[in-house]
Amino acid sequence: MMKCLFLLCLCLVPIVVFSSTFTSQNLIDLPSESPLPKPVLDTNGKELNPNSSYRIISIGRGALGGDVYLGKSPNSDAPCPDGVFRYNSDVGPSGTPVRFIPLSGGIFEDQLLNIQFNIPTVRLCVSYTIWKVGINAYLRTMLLETGGTIGQADSSYFKIVKSSILGYNLLYCPITRPILCPFCRDDDFCAKVGVVIQKGKRRLALVNENPLDVNFKEV
């Protein structure tokens, strides 16, 4: 009888040891939950609201500052203002209010959205409030302009991402990437938005370096 009990104990020892080892080392890697998207915040620390209007303000001061505004593109024959510019200084006029239109839900970092100048306008000029990007052969770059569409697979999609310095950066991220944006070369086929000089005005454009650092102030 004692011999049988002894043999039974010997059989149970490997099971106990295996169970203890398995539990302590946690050999099964359970799938981790995806991190929640981070909401984009305004200058007061509030989450951006698709139903609200905001001014896009540069982080810089003096000649490095200035709000983003809607203006007439040089040499343009468009019937309405069709260019996206930045004022030459933070001491001056306020920028043109915009609203951010996400594909769904709230406004989060690194997610596709449309941008629209939120101003009263005549029917003819409604599409000239929606941001897009177009090629400028003279400057050999792609400029931000208006005349886009909302919710369509074209040249009108952007993202807001956290800046490596202060505030946020804007990215241009077309869905039909290779055709519409030869400048979009990062992993997500997006391009940074910065500033170039066009006939004495600071024009928003796609850049390889020195992106525009901005914040959003509710109107």
Curated annotation (Swiss-Prot):
Induction: By abscisic acid (ABA), jasmonic acid (JA) and wounding. SUPFAM superfamilies: STI-like. It comes from the Eukaryota. SMART domains: STI. The record marks 142-143 as: Reactive bond for chymotrypsin. One of its GO terms (molecular function) is serine-type endopeptidase inhibitor activity. Keywords: Aspartic protease inhibitor, Disulfide bond, Glycoprotein, Protease inhibitor, Serine protease inhibitor, Signal, Stress response. Gene3D superfamilies: 2.80.10.50. Residues 1-23 form the signal peptide. The record marks 99-100 as: Reactive bond for trypsin. Glycans are attached at residue 51. A motif (Vacuolar targeting signal) lies at residues 26-31. Disulfide bonds join 80-125, 173-184. In tubers and green buds of untreated plants. After abscisic acid treatment or mechanical wounding is mostly accumulated in leaves, to a lesser extent in stems, but not in roots. InterPro entries: Kunitz_inhibitor_STI-like_sf (IPR011065), Prot_inh_Kunz-lg (IPR002160). The keyword Signal applies. Residues 24-32 form a propeptide. Belongs to the protease inhibitor I3 (leguminous Kunitz-type inhibitor) family. Inhibitor of cathepsin D (aspartic protease) and trypsin (serine protease). Protects the plant by inhibiting proteases of invading organisms. This is Aspartic protease inhibitor 10. It comes from Solanum tuberosum (Potato). The gene is CDI.
